[in-house]
């Protein structure tokens, strides 16, 4: 450093600062020098201030069909009965079961086949009882 000052003694302070900054940058590539006092310098790595890539923590995981990759058989009554309402005998829709379209069709066909073959009961109820029963009979004043 003393040699640089002796050689560049005729230069002004501003030019000397730029010369020292360039010399430090050449010796340590990938860093830049911040000069904030007369002879006091600090080297800062350029990678410290860059944003870090990470997954979105608020993103919901993708819902996957639980039967994809599984074989659906009309004789498997225990599996098929999970997709039929015990009160009405109606087959639950995709929005309730969470199945993909292909597996929902397979389940529907398997349930119909099992009902025709006699493996599963066919439940028909009076339309008056198709709605869910009310838990509390609360009468409001009119």
From Swiss-Prot:
Q: Name one GO cellular component term.
A: mitochondrial small ribosomal subunit
For this protein, the record's PROSITE patterns field holds: RIBOSOMAL_S18 (PS00057)
Classify the source by domain of life. Eukaryota
Q: Which GO terms describe its biological process?
A: mitochondrial translation; translation
Q: Where would you find this protein in the cell? A: Mitochondrion
Query: Keywords of this protein's UniProt record, alphabetized?
Result: Mitochondrion, Ribonucleoprotein, Ribosomal protein, Transit peptide
List, in alphabetical order, the Gene Ontology terms for molecular function in this entry: small ribosomal subunit rRNA binding; structural constituent of ribosome
Give a yes or no for keyword Lyase in this entry: no
> What family is it from?
Belongs to the bacterial ribosomal protein bS18 family.
What is the annotated quaternary arrangement, including any partners? Component of the mitochondrial small ribosomal subunit (mt-SSU). Mature mammalian 55S mitochondrial ribosomes consist of a small (28S) and a large (39S) subunit. The 28S small subunit contains a 12S ribosomal RNA (12S mt-rRNA) and 30 different proteins. The 39S large subunit contains a 16S rRNA (16S mt-rRNA), a copy of mitochondrial valine transfer RNA (mt-tRNA(Val)), which plays an integral structural role, and 52 different proteins. bS18m has a zinc binding site.
Q: What is this protein called?
A: Small ribosomal subunit protein bS18m
Source species: Homo sapiens (Human)
Taxon lineage = Eukaryota, Metazoa, Chordata, Craniata, Vertebrata
